[in-house]
Amino acid sequence: MSWDSYIDNLIAQTKDASGTGHSDKACIIGIDGGAPWTTAGHANALKLEGQEGPNIARCFKSKDFTPFMSSGIVADGTKYQFLREEDGKLVLAKKKGQGALTLQSSKTAIVIGHAPEGGQQGNTNKGVAVIAEYLESLGM
């Protein structure tokens, strides 16, 4: 099964009333080990390199976000500053000049959306939540 259509759906969910999208990249990884569900070949894929996926998955699986707090979150080769965590399922991060990340887990996956610099992270939060909650509703 290809999960790439979920990237398109997430990005579409971030559009505001004027039709402007507020997420430019996204991906889905497994919560067990951080293996990618979406392909890096998608035009809007957020590409996780090396240990980035496993490091993110380890924090969500254990619900221990201390590594994010002390060292930031690295995704697509960029280190983002941890902003906050909510309910052990949602993490927000930002890097000046690079945009922001929204990460939300379901039972078996972590959905990650990127808001470009100048984009509204709140809209990206909404898009990520739609996909994560849909997966959760399927027991995933």
Swiss-Prot record:
Pfam families: Profilin
Entry keyword set: Acetylation, Actin-binding, Cytoplasm, Cytoskeleton
Compartment annotation: Cytoplasm, Cytoskeleton
A Gene Ontology BP annotation from the UniProt entry: regulation of cellular component organization
Gene Ontology terms for molecular function: actin monomer binding
GO-annotated cellular components: cell cortex; cytoskeleton
Family note: Belongs to the profilin family.
Name under which the protein is recorded: Profilin
